[in-house]
Amino acid sequence: MNIHEYQGKEILASYGVRVQRGIVANNAVEAVAAAKQLTAETGTGWHVIKAQIHAGGRGKGGGVKLAKNLQQVEELAEQIIGMQLITPQTPPEGKKVNKVLVAEDVYYPGESETSEFYVSVLLNRGTGRNMIMYSTEGGMDIEEVAEHTPHLIFTEEIDPTVGLQGFQARRIAFNLGLSGNAFKEMVKFIDALYNAYIGSDASMFEINPVLKTSDNKILAVDAKVNIDDNALYRQPKYAEMRDIREENPIEVEAKEVGLNYVDLDGTVGCMVNGAGLAMATMDLIKYAGFEPANFLDVGGTADAKRVETAFRIILKDPNVKAILINIFGGIVRCDRVAQGVVDAYKNMGDAIKVPIIVRLQGTNAEIAKELIDNSGMPILSAVQFQEAADQVKAALS
């Protein structure tokens, strides 16, 4: 579950991480009030107006602006709230901005130069360990750094039996080129950040940039946080941070009816039982020269109602040009699934305007094929995996 920057900073602050202070605002009037409050509490004269959406690259898209007075705070808040913000990480149409974070300006002059770093904590699925990834190249897309200057990215693997050790936090601060008070502050920052990651059951905490201020303080200027969905049952206060408006509406609907659905960019809709078979089906579609439009696991109870619901969800994606149903009948009987497909087709009528290819293998597969072939519906049936792929290719060629 992704959360907003301001929510991520709330979690960080609760674990002792120093963050750029800010107040969330839903309109220009609230933004001005927030700026006045920040000035009274911090003395800051300038403010940063930051769009709050679940995507990075907001600055490049015009979603982060500097306001030098209250009039600019009001003007920029009016400009950003309600806009369709397009970044490299949003859909082509962008995302609507519903709120902004009015933050203090932390790039003030002082005894030393400011420096920006990149620090993230995430799970390394290859090693099964948590990992801290960091770089001196803060404020940039880490993907660009990895592509052009990979030697500037460092990693620190964390042994799960002992957790983050002091020498590891010190090594990170050393590799970032810090010394004196800034070195000590970074060690504290890394320790608190890791504790926040573990304590919140997160799968990622990305801070970009981490700022060394001109008076040698270390603070989080941004926060991109993902909480593990499987742990939300024991993190109720973080579960309340969910913003459904930021999520794909089709995925939200599928989740509400118990379907495991992930929206993708292709043209071939998939309806499969079992995650492993679903991934294999997606591979087969790609080998056939096409792209899957979704990942959809209907689970072990693929009855008529569930199949019809899955059909309706898949067809909400206007990019779908064909649907491939691939079911292995173990616990589920193939003839029941086939009847569900036929019934769903009858119930939905003209709503289904794309070719449907059905491959059923396992319990009562022969009966299922007869049901489909004798239904009178324009449904193509296949026996072999490759045969199904060939039928998809023929339907879309």
UniProtKB/Swiss-Prot annotation:
Keyword flag S-adenosyl-L-methionine: no
Residues the entry annotates as binding Mg(2+): 208, 222
Keyword line: ATP-binding, Ligase, Magnesium, Metal-binding, Nucleotide-binding, Tricarboxylic acid cycle
UniProt: ATP binding residues: 50, 57-59, 106, 116
Biological process, per Gene Ontology: succinyl-CoA metabolic process; tricarboxylic acid cycle
Limits of the ATP-grasp domain: 9-253
Swiss-Prot/TrEMBL cofactor(s): Mg(2+)
Lineage top rank: taxon: Bacteria
Pathway: Carbohydrate metabolism; tricarboxylic acid cycle; succinate from succinyl-CoA (ligase route): step 1/1
Range of residues in the leader sequence: none
Keyword Lyase: no
Positions bound to substrate: 273, 330-332
GO molecular function terms noted in the UniProt entry: ATP binding; magnesium ion binding; succinate-CoA ligase (ADP-forming) activity; succinate-CoA ligase (GDP-forming) activity
Gene Ontology cellular component terms for the protein in this record: cytosol; succinate-CoA ligase complex
EC number: 6.2.1.5
Pfam families associated with the record: ATP-grasp_2 (PF08442), Ligase_CoA (PF00549)
Catalytic activity: succinate + ATP + CoA = succinyl-CoA + ADP + phosphate; GTP + succinate + CoA = succinyl-CoA + GDP + phosphate
Cofactor note: Binds 1 Mg(2+) ion per subunit.
Family as reported in the entry's similarity comment: Belongs to the succinate/malate CoA ligase beta subunit family.
Subunit: Heterotetramer of two alpha and two beta subunits.
Function: Succinyl-CoA synthetase functions in the citric acid cycle (TCA), coupling the hydrolysis of succinyl-CoA to the synthesis of either ATP or GTP and thus represents the only step of substrate-level phosphorylation in the TCA. The beta subunit provides nucleotide specificity of the enzyme and binds the substrate succinate, while the binding sites for coenzyme A and phosphate are found in the alpha subunit.
Protein name: Succinate--CoA ligase [ADP-forming] subunit beta
Source lineage: Bacteria, Pseudomonadati, Bacteroidota, Flavobacteriia, Flavobacteriales
The gene coding this protein: sucC
